[in-house]
Amino acid sequence: MFNKTSKPQNRIDSLIGATTRIEGNVFFSGGLRVDGMIRGNVAGVDDQPNTLVVSSEARIDGEVLAAHIVVNGTINGPVHATETLELQAGSRVKGDVYYKSIEIHQGAVVEGRLVHHPAEMKGVELKLASGG
């Protein structure tokens, strides 16, 4: 009744295609699916429900922050899931993982620390990716 957790988005509002490469930070609300590559930080808008899906061929080189995160591909950087994190069998994370709730499938790889945060992770700020 008083639990303030958000529900994962069931629909994808934005898609970064397999042949797309982004250099810079990405901010989103709703559902974002990444099939391509992002070199920069990815963050869901704090005051709106958001879900990030990283597909099997996708790669993110940067810090990731979202309420709900599903990883099938590769993330090179710290991951902050303020609600749920699901690491699928083919996922690979190089960096520390901060989560409220986590599900790790057999075959998932994490090269970093797993840090549980039962309370909301407010105040997490992403540093801007420096060019060059």
Walk through the language-model features, giving the residues of each.
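Extended lipid/amphipathic-ligand handling interfaces
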Residues: V64
